[in-house]
């Protein structure tokens, strides 16, 4: 499960974006399912976004539209943990298509 922490931001050059982090905060040491956002440098490998809310993304990274039947598995006991899944599902998950804007833009890291 994640929360939005208003004092946490993603920074890129002069740009600054509010972002969602794990409930346990940011730490160097982490293990799967601990609700910690790992500290480090990572490469963005894929982008998911709400096409109805974000009109255009200009990047060389693969971009995918978030659809109503998309979820993200957050069940550490599942083989699908931390992966995109199709809803409905038996696994614990986060719905990606939501009324709020927490998942309007998702950056998948390596």
Set out the residue ranges of the language-model regions.
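Cell wall/extracellular polymer interaction/catalysis modules
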Residues: 1-110
